[in-house]
Amino acid sequence: MSWVLIGVAGAAGAVARLLVGAWIDGRPGGRAFPWGTFAVNIAGSLLLGLLTGLVVGRGWLAPEVKVVLGAGFLGAFTTFSTWLLDLHEALRRGDHRAAFVNAALSTGLGLLAAWLGLALGWGR
């Protein structure tokens, strides 16, 4: 497998994350909640589940495709570190409700999205 392909996919994922996050966070209403980070993480969970189901469950794609797209593109598209920084920032400014909602929704919907993607990809 080519590390270059993983790097190119990672670069594309990072740019996609930046564009999606900027588009969502740049909408009217300010940034009281980190919707951009939330959206890319939920979408990435769904897509990684789908990709895994298509590779493992159905065998429609080569395992190398899962590595390039999963570790490369989706690894750069999603962002655990920014999510944690957003949680820390909400706690630092005393907005415990926003931190709790972010943690609960991101975790719960992220798991649900991954499960749904896996079920769709697997064909169950």
Curated annotation (Swiss-Prot):
Keywords: Cell membrane, Ion channel, Ion transport, Membrane, Metal-binding, Sodium, Transmembrane, Transmembrane helix, Transport
Catalysed conversion reaction: fluoride(in) = fluoride(out)
Record InterPro entries: FluC
Activity regulation behaviour: Na(+) is not transported, but it plays an essential structural role and its presence is essential for fluoride channel function.
Localisation per UniProt entry: Cell membrane
Record has Cell membrane as a keyword: yes
Bilayer topology annotation: Multi-pass membrane protein
Pfam families assigned to the protein according to its UniProt record, in alphabetical order: CRCB
Function summary: Fluoride-specific ion channel. Important for reducing fluoride concentration in the cell, thus reducing its toxicity.
Protein name per Swiss-Prot or TrEMBL: Fluoride-specific ion channel FluC 1
